[in-house]
């Protein structure tokens, strides 16, 4: 039996923890499963190891959070800092203007119209120029930095949060933008890609497919008539 240190973590636990921590944009659950089985044997599970890690990390306000992709259901693991201001913490390598821009982008995404939870490059440039006086070339450079570091993702010029950003910002978004949020009634996570019925029942795209419900289980309205959340 491997000896545990004073913090309650064995060397194998610490190895897996470091593996997850070093991948700041998150790590695929399947990769961690393979690593766990290499270290502990084929009967070991990711769930058990992560639970053991979280029991120790809890005392230091850290957590490993499992996130399910809202479109395809792929599971990733993310290291979370649960204390302080998550926006400042996630942006510590950045100068103040980038931290402020990130705060603004979070606000604009959360408050955008028509359930879109996303912004075009042009929208970000216009808002940034109006509220912060930043030139388009500067904004574009900052956006690609946020994309490179795993906080924002873009497809065809449309920007939204990554799974890692949603994991890191979960408490912050609930505290600051509770009235602008939708939560999936299946998995209880924030929805930026999904459907909301007129009755208020809400599902991620993946959760809706996985459950295979043709109609809303709350009011029996066809999901085909639901409002789409996000641009995907």
UniProtKB/Swiss-Prot annotation:
Q: Name one GO cellular component term.
A: Smc5-Smc6 complex
Which E.C. number(s) belong to this protein? 2.3.2.27
The Gene Ontology terms for molecular function here are:
ubiquitin protein ligase activity; ubiquitin-protein transferase activity; zinc ion binding
Transmembrane regions: none
Task: Tell me which UniProt keywords the record has, alphabetically.
Answer: DNA damage, DNA recombination, DNA repair, Meiosis, Metal-binding, Nucleus, Transferase, Ubl conjugation pathway, Zinc, Zinc-finger
The answer to whether UniProt assigns keyword Nucleus to this entry is yes
Q: Which domain of life is it from?
A: Eukaryota
> Where on this chain are zinc fingers (RING-type) annotated?
181-222
Subcellular locations according to the entry: Nucleus
| Family annotation (InterPro entries) | Nse1 (IPR011513), Nse1_RING_C4HC3-type (IPR014857), WH-like_DNA-bd_sf (IPR036388)
A biological process term (GO) from this entry? meiosis I
Which reaction does this chain catalyze?
S-ubiquitinyl-[E2 ubiquitin-conjugating enzyme]-L-cysteine + [acceptor protein]-L-lysine = [E2 ubiquitin-conjugating enzyme]-L-cysteine + N(6)-ubiquitinyl-[acceptor protein]-L-lysine
Q: What is its main location?
A: nucleus
Family, according to the entry, reads as follows: Belongs to the NSE1 family.
- Assembly and oligomerization: Two subcomplexes smc5-smc6-nse2 and nse1-nse3-nse4 exist. These subcomplexes are then brought together via a number of interactions, forming the Smc5-Smc6 complex.
User: What function does the entry list?
Assistant: Acts in a DNA repair pathway for removal of UV-induced DNA damage that is distinct from classical nucleotide excision repair and in repair of ionizing radiation damage. Functions in homologous recombination repair of DNA double strand breaks and in recovery of stalled replication forks. Plays a critical role in meiosis.
Q: Which PANTHER family match?
A: NON-SMC ELEMENT 1-RELATED, NON-STRUCTURAL MAINTENANCE OF CHROMOSOMES ELEMENT 1 HOMOLOG
Name the record gives this protein: Non-structural maintenance of chromosomes element 1
Recorded source organism is: Schizosaccharomyces pombe (strain 972 / ATCC 24843)
């Amino acid at each position: 039996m491997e000896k545990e240190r004073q913090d309650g973590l064995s060397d194998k636990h610490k190895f897996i923890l470091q593996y997850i921590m070093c991948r700041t944009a998150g790590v695929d659950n399947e990769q961690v499963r393979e690593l766990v089985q290499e270290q502990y044997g084929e009967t070991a599970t990711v769930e058990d190891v992560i639970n053991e890690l979280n029991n120790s990390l809890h005392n230091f306000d850290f957590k490993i959070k499992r996130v399910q992709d809202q479109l395809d259901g792929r599971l990733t693991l993310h290291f979370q800092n649960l204390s302080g201001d998550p926006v400042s913490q996630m942006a510590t390598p950045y100068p103040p203007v980038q931290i402020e821009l990130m705060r603004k982008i979070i606000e604009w995404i959360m408050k955008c119209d028509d359930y879109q939870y996303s912004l075009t490059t042009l929208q970000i440039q216009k808002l940034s120029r109006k509220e912060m006086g930043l030139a388009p070339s500067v904004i574009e450079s900052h956006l690609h930095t946020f994309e490179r570091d795993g906080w924002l993702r873009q497809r065809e010029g449309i920007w939204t949060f990554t799974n890692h950003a949603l994991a890191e910002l979960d408490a912050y978004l609930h505290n600051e933008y509770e009235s602008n949020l939708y939560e999936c009634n299946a998995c209880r996570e924030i929805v930026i890609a999904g459907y909301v019925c007129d009755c208020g029942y809400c599902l991620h795209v993946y959760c809706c497919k996985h459950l295979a419900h043709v109609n809303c289980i709350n009011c029996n309205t066809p999901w085909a008539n639901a409002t789409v959340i996000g641009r995907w």
